[in-house]
Amino acid sequence: MRIHPPLLTAVAQCLEQIFAEGYYADKVIERAFKANKKWGVRDRKFIAENVYEIVRWWRFLWVVLDEPVNLSEYSLKKLALAYFYVSKKELEINAFVDAFRL
C-alpha cells in the first residue's frame, strides 16, 4: 500500500484539530469527510482507521520519536509515519519518502 501525500496531510490535519483545538476525534473525521466528498471508500477508511489508532497510541509514539510534543504539521506527519513503522503495516518503502514530498 502507498501513502499518498494528501492522505498523510489529512491525517495530520485531523490530529491537529483533535489535539491543538480540542475537538472530538469522531467529529473531526466527520467534518473532514464532508469537506472532501471526492475521497473514496479506501481513502476514508485509511484516514479514519489511522487517526483513531494514532490518537490511541499518542504518548507512545512521541516516546518512540524521542521528541517533545509538537503540533506542527510536519511533526504530526512524522508522528503518523512513526505509527506506520511501529505498527508494521504493509507499506512500500518508497511510500515513506514520497509522503514527505510537498
Regions from the PLM with identified roles:
Residues 1-102:
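Class I Rossmann-like S-adenosyl-L-methionine
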